[in-house]
Design a protein with these regions (language model features):
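C-terminal catalytic subdomain
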Residues: 300-431
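Short catalytic helix/loop segments, enriched in acidic residues and glycine
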Residues: 25-41
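Short beta-strand segments enriched in small/hydrophobic residues
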Residues: 3-26, 175-184
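Structural motif
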Residues: 52-66, 158
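Cap/lid and interdomain-hinge subdomains that line or gate substrate/regulatory clefts
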Residues: 45-48, 104, 109-244
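Extended hydrophobic packing segments that form well-structured cores
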Residues: 379-508
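Long, internal scaffold/assembly segments composed of regular secondary structure
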Residues: 231-232, 236-330
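Short, well-structured alpha-helical segments in soluble
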Residues: 60-73, 90-92, 261-270
Length: 508
């Protein structure tokens, strides 16, 4: 099943009645053929649905209102086949709440030089009509993506596909509930933020849930369920045979981890939550035999299922990871929540070890993860605990984070290169080693100047284009650190953005 089967993107063609009935028929036929071609290309993750040609203000308004009210519709593509006077789009655009992609293309690829007459030129006026439509969108400060290119070409289809994935991620976030088991880690600034503004701007609804409530679900988990999940662990992951010895402490720790996973999944499903956070200083009543350490293995596996996760109460990362996972569906290389841990200064190959105490998603593993039990001496409960151990794939990727700047949210994106790490025999955790682009000095320096977190959401498959589209839809700031970044220019960008986002509130 396609992960995006529940969604549609609507295609609306712009024209007018000035050119006569034959033109109206031709526009409709061409539009149908284009939409069928887009769907049959095999390049688009979301079905395109042709919603007809709009020839008047009332028709525009009707189709955009319908888009707003259709839960399956996650975005709208507009294309002007003929000249379509843009004042007729004003009322509809004022009401459109779904993401907008303006496709500047043409039914025919090339000009038929020997046969083109005035009728042909009047019919095929995308060069004319799309500029008119673009003007009114800009005049109205309508945020949208503009894709320019022939509709059958690979690059055009790729840009539409990127937009569709972002629209799906955006739609998913509009009813996103994040559950915080406990509060944020004390005295940490960057994981905090304005939850009211986050819901207004990005759709995130963040609720506190006392760990005592989670423990009630934990108590209800049957031993048979736990035994079955432990058997699944042993089937899916490499492990020492001794780990299956039920008389050992190590087996008991695996069993405890399985019960924690079942309890967290149960409460998330009961509440309809799409993500959660934990805090190693809030693990429930010590008098009840609940969590003996942070539920690291549970967090790893739940991330792989698609639940957002943030450590130490980091609800913004939990929400963002869920969006990353949705956008990443059907792409091959995987994604994870990660944390900057340790620097490795090695000249041009200077890098950052990405890890966490336990919670790294196995979707990015280079090989089959290994189930192990080791001591974790941090937080309110210091104990042996189960986890999946692996290193990440080698290759390029992109990592992102959202920070609260006080007057706005800032999305920070950094291109990275994951490289092969040396063995870590004394550090039994999942990890990745990457070089932030353009190098550690500039990449890390720019990230710090932007106020970036130590937590981020990483994907091998997503690129900065996805995040640019996301920021455009959300109406938030985005800064991109890449191979061309210099500290001098990046500082200027941050300063200009500071002024822009203060003045922009007066324009909206």
């Amino acid at each position: 099943m396609n992960a995006f089967d529940q969604y549609e993107v609507w295609f609306v063609t712009g024209a007018q009645l000035l050119y006569g009935g034959d033109a109206v028929i031709a526009v409709d036929a061409h539009s149908n053929e284009m939409v069928n071609g887009l769907n049959e290309s095999g390049k688009l993750p979301v079905k395109v649905v042709y919603k007809g040609t709009a020839n008047s203000s009332k028709e525009v308004e009707a189709v955009f209102k319908a888009a707003n009210n259709d839960e399956k519709c996650v975005g709208v593509i507009t294309w002007m086949h003929t000249f379509s006077p843009a004042k007729m789009w004003i009322h509809g655009l004022q009401q459109l709440k779904k993401p907008l992609l303006h496709l500047h293309t043409q039914f025919n690829k090339e000009i038929p030089w020997d046969t083109m007459d005035m009728d042909f030129m009047n019919l095929n006026q995308s060069a004319h009509g799309d500029r008119e439509f673009g003007h009114i969108c800009t005049r109205m400060r309508i945020r949208r993506k503009v894709v320019v290119g022939y509709w059958k070409e690979e690059e055009t289809l790729h840009k539409i596909a990127v937009s569709m994935r972002v629209c799906a991620g955006w739609a998913d976030s509009q009813d996103m509930l994040i559950i915080r088991f406990g509060d944020q880690m004390n005295n940490v600034a960057v994981t905090d933020g304005d939850k009211v503004e986050a819901e207004q701007r990005m759709g995130y609804h963040v609720d506190y849930c006392p760990v005592s409530e989670l423990m009630e679900y934990h108590k209800d988990i049957k031993n048979e369920e736990v035994d079955a999940l432990v058997a699944t662990y042993f089937k899916e992951y490499d492990h020492d045979a001794s780990l299956e010895d039920k008389s050992t402490e190590a087996y008991q720790k695996v069993w405890n981890a399985a019960k924690a996973e079942l309890a967290i999944r149960a409460i998330l499903k009961a509440k309809g939550a799409k993500g959660f956070t934990t805090n190693f200083d809030d693990l429930g009543d010590i008098e009840y035999n609940g969590f003996d350490q942070i539920p690291g293995l549970a967090s790893q596996r739940l991330m792989a299922e698609g639940y957002g996760f943030g450590a130490e109460g980091d609800w913004k990362s939990a929400a963002l990871y869920r969006t990353v996972w949705v956008m990443n569906q059907g792409l091959p290389k995987g994604c994870s929540f990660l944390e900057d841990y340790t620097l490795n200064f090695d000249g041009a190959n200077s890098s950052i070890l990405q890890s966490h105490m336990l919670e790294v998603c196995p979707l990015i593993a280079a090989n089959k993860p290994r189930l192990e039990v080791h001591f974790l001496g941090i937080g309110i409960r210091k104990s042996q605990t189960a986890r999946l151990v692996f290193t990440s794939k080698v290759g390029t990727g992109c990592t992102a984070t959202i920070v609260d700047m006080g007057n706005r949210f800032r999305l920070i994106v950094n291109d990275v290169e994951c490289i092969e790490p040396k063995p870590l025999p004394k550090l039994p955790v999942a990890s990745a080693l990457w070089i932030p682009m353009p190098n550690l000095e500039v990449g890390a320096g720019a990230w710090i100047l932007a106020g970036g977190t130590h937590h981020s959401c990483f994907s091998y498959d997503l690129t900065a284009e996805y995040w640019e589209d996301y920021a455009e839809i959300a109406g938030i700031e985005m800064v991109h650190i890449n191979k061309d970044t210099t500290i001098s220019c990046f500082k200027k960008e941050l300063r200009m953005n500071e002024v822009y986002y203060m003045l922009n509130k007066a324009l909206c």
